[in-house]
């Protein structure tokens, strides 16, 4: 989070990206770049307070597995990243594809 080269790279790449996703404490990196300003966000439960400090202009949810703002989405912990990923698959390719993907992974997805 305190690596300016990394956060500058994330900010630059995000300007070209169709989607920007973070899993777990990756939300802190997005916060550091300002990408969460004015958006909803979440992160691992152990980093919620730090995310609130790092992204004071974001609405931080401690009770959500993931948050989808359209172009920017964040998940809570690592396993919640699977839920977010399947949500994005459903959004881009349809619910049936996401359900087949979850079955292939043997993951009990509950959209």
Model feature map: region roles:
Residues 1-111:
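Active-site-adjacent pocket-lining segments in enzyme domains
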């Amino acid at each position: 989070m305190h690596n300016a080269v990394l956060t500058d790279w994330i900010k630059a790449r995000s300007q070209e990206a169709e989607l920007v996703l973070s899993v777990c404490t990756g939300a802190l990196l997005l916060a550091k770049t300002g990408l969460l300003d004015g958006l909803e966000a979440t992160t691992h439960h152990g980093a919620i307070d730090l995310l609130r400090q790092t992204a004071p202009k974001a609405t931080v949810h401690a009770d959500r597995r993931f948050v989808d703002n359209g172009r920017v989405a964040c998940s809570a912990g690592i396993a919640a990243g699977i839920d977010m990923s399947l949500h994005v698959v459903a959004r881009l390719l349809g619910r049936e594809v996401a359900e087949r993907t979850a079955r292939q992974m043997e993951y009990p997805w509950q959209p």
